[in-house]
């Protein structure tokens, strides 16, 4: 495992804080000194840096999709002249574009669907122009599509679409190359709904290499962070914090791309022994409840079990579902574990 150093100065309750992470790390301090704030920002940094290229691509993809969605109102307005199959084909193509990610086809697949959508628009527009008799309506639609003359439909649509895609692609390539720290700040604010502002003095090093510089460094040995908060603040059913909804998702759902960790069965056996039971799934109408089943036969919903049990239960599920691996930073913000020394990890 790589060695990490994380520092924040003069941010809310934090005056000066330095932590080194190499294996198990315990952060100790008085109540209100900023331990949770420190942990939260470490979570933000790791989870944003580790998928930065995916963020760049999703922003690129979303701009392309929005450029096509703006025509939907016009297509509805001129629906009397549209072939229903062509309109459905266009909508289906947009739906497929929303599912394109950096890892399942990237730019090449997005370009393919984009050209298909543009071709569909071209066909529908030509069909409309052949039948529409109102010159004002014709001009209105042509203006929306950026077409100068009615007899230049194919040329203008092709030129405009190529130009837009090229400009967006260039911006995407520039972001990948430059990796601006301003982008990291914007993503943390939007994705995690963080309203307190980015710390003025913050540092994150992997093996003594600073990653939070003007051109963001790439994180090598971690691919995600998981945050287990104070039990009283956690509800697997409802939460307004992204950290908690992310945890809830991982506790409930299997990671289809997850990998086995060394000693998985031994870990699971050890945790089951500590909690003197296991976690089972029980159907509850259209949902699934996670239930603690004790070795003496009692069933208790996870939400209702003792606070000291919860971190272990969540760890158990994270391991079972394939989310907790050797490349995961697990943060447990759990004061009550101090009441149970045998459960401290």
What residue ranges belong to the model's regions?
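Phosphate-coordinating catalytic segments in nucleotide- and nucleic-acid-processing enzymes
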Residues: 5-7, 48-327
